[in-house]
């Protein structure tokens, strides 16, 4: 089965072809970073229009790159949610229309399920069950995954997501968008112990809170009164986020008795987070798994693969084009 995956939940237009026998046949990705950079964040209307502009050219590029003919596509998977309404709708309309024209099934995929399953595309994929740490611009969650569609929420952020905190602090520091990679780069030359930023809710269950940390950084920047300590601020802020994510992940593994941790989402590319996770998990004889570097950020491959997992069980959507901008993973069902 060859599945076309379409990702348009935010500011990346990603398309990919997943072959159940040959694996990933090809993928293309267009980022809108330059478009949104001058605004310091994603402008939903601009994002939607840019998806419309790029979908057909990227589709043609993907088919040429992979050597797959449009008629060979067996099914279409598109991101149904969560995400920006307009952005989701462009991908859903494109995918549903294409599937209808080819007389093939289509299925709407949960964006974060795609991220969580992306490490299964690696050369050494994890086996179920595992704990998943999902960290992105819109989500920070710990899930126990027992199988496709069998997800138990262990903890989540009660306010800002980790990636959102990175972006907001970067904006405070006048760093370019996107904030996460730029803070990580600046942190390399800073002292992570220079400022003792709070780790809210560190010892309170498995939920997260990052708004207080963001406020603490804002207060510290005002105290510095123009003194350039940006590298130390970046390193200390990043350390507070990483410390919280690592300790909560270890706690989740101990609480569930599981020995495998999957980390997925854009923030999973953070090298300091990976380094600290590997060190901490080695102490409890647990393993950590990541997606391939190209699959950490939003992409079509994860949507194609997640869609395939459900399509092979006979699950697909009707003719109606549906999007779900707010969609808890716990509402997902087991494909039957």
Curated annotation (Swiss-Prot):
Q: Which cofactor does it need?
A: Fe(2+)
Query: What are the EC numbers?
Result: 2.3.1.234
Give yes or no: UniProt keyword Metal-binding: yes
Q: How is the cofactor bound?
A: Binds 1 Fe(2+) ion per subunit.
Q: Where does substrate bind?
A: 134-138, 167, 180, 270
User: An example of a Gene Ontology BP annotation on this entry?
Assistant: tRNA threonylcarbamoyladenosine modification
Alphabetized, the UniProt keywords read: Acyltransferase, Cytoplasm, Iron, Metal-binding, Transferase, tRNA processing
Binding-site residues for Fe cation, renumbered to this chain: 111, 115, 298
Q: Which Pfam families match?
A: TsaD
Q: An example Gene Ontology cellular component term from the record?
A: cytoplasm
From the UniProt record, which GO molecular function terms apply? iron ion binding; N(6)-L-threonylcarbamoyladenine synthase activity
- PROSITE patterns from the UniProt entry: GLYCOPROTEASE
Q: What family does this belong to?
A: Belongs to the KAE1 / TsaD family.
Q: What does this protein do?
A: Required for the formation of a threonylcarbamoyl group on adenosine at position 37 (t(6)A37) in tRNAs that read codons beginning with adenine. Is involved in the transfer of the threonylcarbamoyl moiety of threonylcarbamoyl-AMP (TC-AMP) to the N6 group of A37, together with TsaE and TsaB. TsaD likely plays a direct catalytic role in this reaction.
Q: State the protein's name.
A: tRNA N6-adenosine threonylcarbamoyltransferase
Origin species, per record, is Acinetobacter baumannii (strain AYE)
């Amino acid at each position: 089965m060859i599945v076309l995956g379409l990702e348009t939940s935010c500011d990346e237009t990603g398309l990919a072809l997943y072959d159940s026998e040959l694996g990933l046949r090809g993928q293309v990705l267009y980022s809108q970073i330059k478009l949104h950079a001058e605004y310091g964040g994603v402008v939903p209307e601009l994002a939607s229009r840019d998806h419309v502009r790029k979908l057909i050219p990227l589709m043609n590029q993907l088919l040429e790159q992979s050597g797959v003919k449009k008629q060979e596509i067996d099914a279409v998977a598109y991101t149904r949610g969560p995400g920006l309404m307009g952005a989701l709708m462009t991908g859903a309309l494109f995918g549903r229309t294409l599937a209808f024209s080819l007389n093939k099934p289509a299925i709407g995929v949960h964006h974060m399920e795609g991220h969580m399953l992306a490490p299964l595309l690696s050369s050494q994929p994890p086996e179920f069950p595992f704990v998943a740490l999902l960290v992105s611009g819109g989500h920070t969650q710990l899930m126990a995954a027992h199988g496709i569609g069998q997800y138990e929420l262990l903890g989540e952020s009660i306010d800002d997501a980790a990636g959102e905190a990175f972006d907001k602090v970067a904006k405070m520091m006048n760093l370019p968008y996107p904030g996460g990679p730029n803070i990580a780069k600046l942190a390399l030359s800073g002292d992570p112990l220079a400022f003792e930023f709070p780790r809210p809710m560190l010892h309170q269950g498995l939920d997260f809170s990052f708004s207080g940390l963001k406020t603490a950084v804002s207060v510290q920047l005002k105290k510095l009164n123009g003194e350039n300590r940006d590298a130390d601020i970046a390193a200390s802020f990043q350390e507070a986020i990483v410390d919280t994510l690592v300790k909560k992940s270890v706690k989740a593994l101990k609480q569930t008795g599981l020995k495998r941790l999957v980390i997925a989402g854009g923030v999973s590319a953070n090298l300091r987070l990976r380094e600290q996770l590997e060190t901490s998990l080695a102490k409890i004889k647990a393993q950590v798994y990541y997606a391939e570097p190209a699959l950490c950020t939003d992409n079509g491959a994860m949507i194609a693969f997640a869609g395939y997992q459900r399509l092979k069980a006979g699950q697909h959507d009707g003719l109606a084009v549906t999007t779900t901008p707010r969609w808890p993973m716990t509402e997902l069902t087991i494909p039957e």
